[in-house]
Regions:
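N-terminal helical cap/lid subdomain that shapes the substrate entry/recognition surface
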Residues: 3-104, 114-117, 126
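Anionic-ligand binding region
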Residues: 120-121
């Protein structure tokens, strides 16, 4: 049976971006002058995306509003996606083989579409 299509997650699968995502919470706390406990730091690296903002505000005491945190996430990831993001090692060769075989490829991500398009372009894989 021949592979006809493939769906890829973007962050951490196509792109080497997870370290940047993981450092956002701790960076925000440092900027607000808050020292995270080792347990809080561990939790920030393991929580689901939807749980990070409430955790930063309610448990860690980050004084920013939910919207301020969201705006900061978008701004910082846009900067990263515009200039620093790279594809995972070996990805371009793999995608080129799939393309050559006529496999339809799709990206599934929770990241905003504008940022997704920017990231894929910067990483040089938007043409797949």
């Amino acid at each position: 049976m021949r592979l006809q299509s493939a769906i890829f997650d973007m962050d951490g699968t196509l792109l080497d971006s997870m370290p940047t995502w993981r450092e956002l919470g701790p960076t925000f706390l440092k900027e607000a002058g808050i020292s995270a406990t080792p347990e809080q730091d561990r939790m920030l690296h393991t929580l689901a995306d939807c749980d990070v903002i409430p955790y930063l505000r309610e448990v860690c005491g980050l004084p920013w509003s939910q919207q301020e945190i969201i705006d900061q996430i978008i701004q910082r990831m846009e900067t990263f996606y515009s200039s620093q993001v790279r594809p995972k090692p070996g990805l371009e060769k793999f995608l080129s083989i799939l393309k050559m075989e006529g496999v339809w490829m799709y990206v599934a991500t929770a990241t905003h579409r504008r940022l997704t398009e920017k990231a894929l372009k910067t990483a040089g894989i938007d043409h797949y």
